[in-house]
């Protein structure tokens, strides 16, 4: 602003003063300059001897320039201030003197307008009442309309500022406002517009004081509602809409609310009556007004030949009043009768030109119909603005009204040549504006263009108004031959068909036309369509998107090449800008099944930057920035790991099992069987197991969708990068479910800090130095606090004693490619198909048989896979089977804690301890005996366990043989193929017992776990980690007895060995077959196991850890046994 510039250091510079470089160059402050300016203006009006600036013009010649002088003076900022009071006082005196004279009254009003706006508060309060009286005197005179208009403008400012000062507000309300209104009501007819402006100001700033004259004001406004002057009619409607707020209301505006509703119903009743009079007989089924409103008594001129015109003018005025009441702010809450208003709108829009007779007054009624429809559309727009999205329940009705109106006013639009305005464009423009407003208010819920007959009709009209007109020239035949045949008669030379350009039509090159014809309706259609696509794009049908692509892309290219220009609406820059806006909307909100035209849009926006119109070129530049952000984001995406893992979190480096990790997510009941046993490896094709599929985790929180491994990842903080989806992580021979991706390439390490939105119930830590089995060390903590450390053959120099009954050396598994999926007992996979029938165990990892032989040995042990459907840990993907099914979460937690402690000890003594399978079995027998002594009530169960142990030992021996032959691989595939990288020795946390609500695994599983070599062979073929899930039956338990070598040992091992995982392996291997069958025994067995485990840990921690370490060593060979699939082939 100029004031800000002048108040700065250079405020007094001559550059800021048009007067020249004379005396003002020495002025150093803005206030001083303003004082000189005020004195200069005063000198222009009345010369003074002491003025610093001599008058330039005589006073009589300064009057025409005074309004301009006031405006120029305002450019220099406020003239108020203590230092300017003297100058302002002089201006006040001048103003009062000029207002007292008829000849100089206009000049006095000019000075008063400056004083009212620029005077300080103290000066304003001092002179406000006197100024108000002066204005009232001016209103009572017969001055010219220009003087009255200026007086009303000053009055408006005066009332606006006085309403802000309580003392003045009270004084004016009680003593002056009624007189002012009376003076305004008495103005001459030629000053009616100024009178309405003054009344509007009084009702706006002093509504309560106007209540005494409410009746007179209402009559005055109604008499002007049907005025022919648009400005006067608009002012009368605005004033009438404020009538309900006049006067004193009750405490909460109740009286005002009732007045507002009465006025609205009265307007509706009057509008229904007027519509019936206008189109009597033209309505097929007129809607009768049933509202409580009383029809207004409007004056009518009898004998007027243009009564229809008067009715139309009244209809327009009352409709505007109704719309203003809906759209204007009101001091109290009101209830809008939406249904009644919509009924009136529908009744008005249903009047069609087809039903109007062309006799008598018919043509005149037809002439008025478009304007009547426009008033109804304006009312609909006001209703949408007032009610917003609360009109959604009437969305279908609104969606039908718009194409209905477009159909009514589409007659004769195709018969005109380019360059001519199409008929009814104003009505169609209003319809498209309402479409844009409706979508803007309701968004995608508006339901526009989302199918249905009305949507198709609306789209057809939109495309018609967007498409540029085409020159249509038709061939005509020689005269006298309408059919085109030559005339008969004298022979003559053959004649050629000529172009029919019309008799009175000039050649196309010299045609007269409007270059901006139809630009308004085209721009409105483009805006409405752009808004609809942007808000509802993904919900709109694919075919609609394709139609728009086929229209918009060629149209943009034609506009850029100048082919579409000429007499088309796209000569207007507004239409071209809206066309680019539509293209951007198609790009930002595409159909899910129709790719957006990204490449074409980028090219179009690049060329659009060369537009001559700054408005168009700037929009294209902005659109390019938006497209660049979409195609080349400068910031990496939040989830770079891959789409298949919805909530993966980076895996921290391997760390020792922590006893602090509680197994809070042990869902009791059969649910665990389905969800907790997901296998990391490929899902076996066994019929029952697929049902488990990617099992949703039973834990609360975001559902963990099946990961790339086909397993639900409940407990893992993140999925190892190598398990993430990727070409190197997908094996060709994948089974039904996604396969654990054992790739030969080293997996990328994931920073432990990153978490991609997934919750972190129990973190699992996996560290991969290489993709080779020997280089992989996995430390997973299960929900049951069980942690298993698997060191593939390469890492531990100690000989790998088979953890389960089988003692196959890890070398055999090592022989197969390094990537040998840990193989659960081959019998388990066989039983899994049958077992899943009773139990829906979590899907076993699909057998990695097809996977590359060199699958990385890293194995994932299901961390605390809750016995319930809780999210299965990736550890299950390994051949490790967590079958411990307990009905009591407490027992599982205790066992898990013991197992975690044992796991820590195992990891420490892993390399040092190596024991034979016989010792391992003896420990299991001792644990069983301890359980029997501790729990006499469960003697029967203990006996069954012993029997099962014996059976499992035999089965383990058989499994060892089977594994050596590689037969277990196929079985594992059927049951639950363990992930090729997971060694069978890894014992899943005891939470898996919950996974299988059926009987808990008995020591037989431990025996099998001790047979990692055979299991590894089978795992290589099938990698069934989920086999434990399919161990619900005893037979299955026996089969699992072989596979449990890969599965986690039961808690019994935990007691015997300091490391919890060995006990889990024993229990799981034994329970893999037995526990699944006797679910009731599971809790008791687990409790006995937990107690005996505590004792065994103290007594035989070292021995147990050694046995388990041997088992774990054997497990890596199982991972290496992924070649077993190839071995069976060989």
Swiss-Prot record:
CC annotations in GO: cytoplasm; euchromatin; membrane; MLL1 complex; nucleolus; nucleoplasm; nucleus
Region annotation Required for modulation of ESR1 transcriptional activity: where it falls in the sequence: 2-80, 121-189
Spans annotated as Disordered: 473-497, 639-1130
PTM comment text: Transiently sumoylated, preferentially conjugated to SUMO2 or SUMO3. Sumoylation causes nucleolar exclusion of PELP1 and promotes the recruitment of MDN1 to pre-60S particles. Desumoylation by SUMO isopeptidase SENP3 is needed to release both PELP1 and MDN1 from pre-ribosomes.
Motif LXXLL motif 7: positions: 271-275
UniProt feature coiled coil, ranges: none
Motif (LXXLL motif 6): 264-268
Comp. bias (Low complexity): 672-684
LXXLL motif 2 (motif): residue ranges: 69-73
Domain writeup: The Glu-rich region mediates histones interaction. The Leu-Xaa-Xaa-Leu-Leu (LXXLL) motifs are required for the association with nuclear receptor ESR1.
Protein name stated in the entry: Proline-, glutamic acid- and leucine-rich protein 1
């Amino acid at each position: 602003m100029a004031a800000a510039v002048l108040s700065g250091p250079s405020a007094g510079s001559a550059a800021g003063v048009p007067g020249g470089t004379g005396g003002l160059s020495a002025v150093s402050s803005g206030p001083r300059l303003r004082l000189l300016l005020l004195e200069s203006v005063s000198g222009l009006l009345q010369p003074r001897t002491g003025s610093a600036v001599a008058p330039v013009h005589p006073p009589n010649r300064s009057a025409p320039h005074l309004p301009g002088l006031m405006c120029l003076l305002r450019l220099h900022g406020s003239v108020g201030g203590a230092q300017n009071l003297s100058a302002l006082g002089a201006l006040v005196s001048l103003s009062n003197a000029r207002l007292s004279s008829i000849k100089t009254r206009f000049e006095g009003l000019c000075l008063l307008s400056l004083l009212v706006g620029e005077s300080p508060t103290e000066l304003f309060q001092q002179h406000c009442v006197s100024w108000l009286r002066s204005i009232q005197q001016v209103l009572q005179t017969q001055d010219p309309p220009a003087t009255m208009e200026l007086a009303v403008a000053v009055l408006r400012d005066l009332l606006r500022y006085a309403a802000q000062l309580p003392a003045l507000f009270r004084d004016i309300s009680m003593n002056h406002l009624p007189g002012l209104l009376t003076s305004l009501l008495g103005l001459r007819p030629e000053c009616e517009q100024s009178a309405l402006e003054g009344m509007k100001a009084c009702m706006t700033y002093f509504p309560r004081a106007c209540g005494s004259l409410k009746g007179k004001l209402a009559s005055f406004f109604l008499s002007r509602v049907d005025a022919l002057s648009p400005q006067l009619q608009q002012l009368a409607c605005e004033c009438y809409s404020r009538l309900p707020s006049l006067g004193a209301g009750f405490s909460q505006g109740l009286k005002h609310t009732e007045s507002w509703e009465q006025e609205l119903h009265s307007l509706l009743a009057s509008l229904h009556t007027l519509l019936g009079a206008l189109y009597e007989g033209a309505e097929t089924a007129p809607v009768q007004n049933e509202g409580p409103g009383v029809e207004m008594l409007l004056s009518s001129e009898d004998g007027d030949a243009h009564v229809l015109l008067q009715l139309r003018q009244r209809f327009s005025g009352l409709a505007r009043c109704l719309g203003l009441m809906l759209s204007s702010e009101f001091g109290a809450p009101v209830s809008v009768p939406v249904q009644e208003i919509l009924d009136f709108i529908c009744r008005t829009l249903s009047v069609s030109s087809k039903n109007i007779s062309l006799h008598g007054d018919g043509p005149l009624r037809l002439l008025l119909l478009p304007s009547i429809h426009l008033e109804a559309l304006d009312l609909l727009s006001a209703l949408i603005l007032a009610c917003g999205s609360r009109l959604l329940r009437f969305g279908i009705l609104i969606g039908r009204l718009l194409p209905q109106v477009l159909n009514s006013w589409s007659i004769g639009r195709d018969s005109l040549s380019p360059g001519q305005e199409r008929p009814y464009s104003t009505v169609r423009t209003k319809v498209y504006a309402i479409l844009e407003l409706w979508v803007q208010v309701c968004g995608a819920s508006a339901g526009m263009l989302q199918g249905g007959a009305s949507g198709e009709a609306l789209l057809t009209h939109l495309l018609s108004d967007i498409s540029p007109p085409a020159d249509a020239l038709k061939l005509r035949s020689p005269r006298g031959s309408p059919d085109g045949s030559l005339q008969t008669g004298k022979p003559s030379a053959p004649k050629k068909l000529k172009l029919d350009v019309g008799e009175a039509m000039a050649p196309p090159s010299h045609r007269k036309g409007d270059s901006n014809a139809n630009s308004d309706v085209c721009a409105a259609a483009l805006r409405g369509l752009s808004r609809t696509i942007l808000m509802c794009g993904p919900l709109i049908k694919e075919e609609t998107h394709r139609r728009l692509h086929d229209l918009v892309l060629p149209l943009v290219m034609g506009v850029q090449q100048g082919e579409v220009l000429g007499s088309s609406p796209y000569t207007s820059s507004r239409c071209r800008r809206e066309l680019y806006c539509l293209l951007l909307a198609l790009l930002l909100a595409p159909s899910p099944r129709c790719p957006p035209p990204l490449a074409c849009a980028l090219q179009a926006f690049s060329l659009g930057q060369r537009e001559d119109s700054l408005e168009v070129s700037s929009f294209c530049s902005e659109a390019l920035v938006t497209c660049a952000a979409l195609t080349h984001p400068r910031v990496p995406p939040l989830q770079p790991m891959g789409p298949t893992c919805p909530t993966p979190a980076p895996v921290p480096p391997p760390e020792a099992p922590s006893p602090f990790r509680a197994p809070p997510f042990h869902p009791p009941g059969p649910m665990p069987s389905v969800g907790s046993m997901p296998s990391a490896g490929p899902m076996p094709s066994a019929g029952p197991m697929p049902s488990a599929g990617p099992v949703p985790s039973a834990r609360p929180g975001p559902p963990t969708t099946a990961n790339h491994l086909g397993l639900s990842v409940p407990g893992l903080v993140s999925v190892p990068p190598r398990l993430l989806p990727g070409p190197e992580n997908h094996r060709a021979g994948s089974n039904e479910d996604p396969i654990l991706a054992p790739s030969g390439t080293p997996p990328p390490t994931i920073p432990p800090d990153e978490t991609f939105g997934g919750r972190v119930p129990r973190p699992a830590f996996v560290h991969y130095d290489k993709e080779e089995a020997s280089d992989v060390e996995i430390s997973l903590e299960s929900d049951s606090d069980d942690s298993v450390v698997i060191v593939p053959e390469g890492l531990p120099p100690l000989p790998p004693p088979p953890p389960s009954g089988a003692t196959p050396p890890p070398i055999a598994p090592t022989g197969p490619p390094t990537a040998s999926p840990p193989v659960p007992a081959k019998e388990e996979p066989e039983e899994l198909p049958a077992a899943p029938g009773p139990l829906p165990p979590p899907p076993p990892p699909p057998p990695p048989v097809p996977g590359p032989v060199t699958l990385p040995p890293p194995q994932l042990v299901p961390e605390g896979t809750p016995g319930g459907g809780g999210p299965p840990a990736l550890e299950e993907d390994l051949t490790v089977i967590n079958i411990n099914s307990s009905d009591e979460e407490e027992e599982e937690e205790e066992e898990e804690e013991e197992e975690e402690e044992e796991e820590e000890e195992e990891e420490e003594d892993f390399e040092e301890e190596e024991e034979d399978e016989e010792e391992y079995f003896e420990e299991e027998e001792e644990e069983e005996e301890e359980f029997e002594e501790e729990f006499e009530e469960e003697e029967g169960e203990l006996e069954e366990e012993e029997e099962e142990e014996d059976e499992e030992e035999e089965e383990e021996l058989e499994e060892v043989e089977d594994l050596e032959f590689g037969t277990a691989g196929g079985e594992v595939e059927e049951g639950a193929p363990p992930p090729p990288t997971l060694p069978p020795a890894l014992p899943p946390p005891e939470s898996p017992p919950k996974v299988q609500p059926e009987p808990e695994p008995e020591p037989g599983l431990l025996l099998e776990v001790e047979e990692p070599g055979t299991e590894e062979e089978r795992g290589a073929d099938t990698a069934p980690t989920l086999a434990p899930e399919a161990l619900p039956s005893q037979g299955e338990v026996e089969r699992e007895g072989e596979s449990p070598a890969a599965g986690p040992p039961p808690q019994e091992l935990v007691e015997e060995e300091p490391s919890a995982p060995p006990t889990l392996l024993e229990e799981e291997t034994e329970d893999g077959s037995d526990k699944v069958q006797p679910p009731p025994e599971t809790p008791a067995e687990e409790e006995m196991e937990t107690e005996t485990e505590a004792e065994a840990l103290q007594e035989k921690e070292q021995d147990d850890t050694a046995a388990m370490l041997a088992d774990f060593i054997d497990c890596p060979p199982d991972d290496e046994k992924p070649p077993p699939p190839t071995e069976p082939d060989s």
